[in-house]
Amino acid sequence: RTTGGLEALDDKIRNVGGKATLLPLNLAHLDEIDKLGPTLAERFGRLDIFVGNAGVLGPLSPVGHIKAKDWEKVFKINFMANVRLVQTLDPLLRASEAGRVVFTTSDIADEAPAYWGGYAASKSALNTFMRTYAAETEKTNMRINAIHPGAVQTAMMTEAFPGGPSFKLKTPEQVVNDYLAIVANNCPHHGQIIKLP
């Protein structure tokens, strides 16, 4: 979420013998997103995997009390940023032998609980977008899916439940293998929302 966080991740990758290219990008600035595809095309020529994981919670409030700017922010990050990312990255994903796209979603999209209007609606829109993109890539080697990882220990979870939730949280490390499985070359799923236990 920050340049410092990216640099710390880069250090971890290098410490285990890997290498990374850092491309800081503010997803709230949609015009900046459009530059990502050409930059990656110039450097790499293709993209094998895109994980759309960024998200914001937005206000947990009655829908009539949520300000327009807050609705716009939630939809900009949770939905429109992913649309723009797919648009700029699509040619690179198609250039891959087996392009993979996975979005992080939530069962909140289907449950639509009270006070979660912005988040629920934005994730519902993302799910529909994922299924549409999957239908458009049906006759390719690409696989487009979404994962609902369940309750994971993240800053967003802390924001949603400041006193701590009444249910057990998974760690990000506990769900990473599920993400790796869905972006693997042998992944059979396409256009699916995979709900983790």
For each predicted feature, which ranges?
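The beta1-alpha1 cofactor-binding region of Rossmann-like NAD(H)/NADP(H)-dependent oxidoreductases
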Residues: 3-4, 24-35, 68
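Rossmann-fold cofactor-recognition segment
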Residues: 13-29
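Conserved NAD(P)H cofactor-binding loop of Rossmann-fold oxidoreductase domains
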Residues: 53-59
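Catalytic loop of short-chain dehydrogenase/reductase
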Residues: 56, 94, 99-125, 130-139, ...
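Substrate-binding pocket helix/loop in short-chain dehydrogenase/reductase
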Residues: 61-63, 70-72
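A short, exposed helix-loop element centered on a Lys and neighboring polar residues
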Residues: 86-87, 131
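C-terminal helical subdomain
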Residues: 139, 146, 154, 163-197
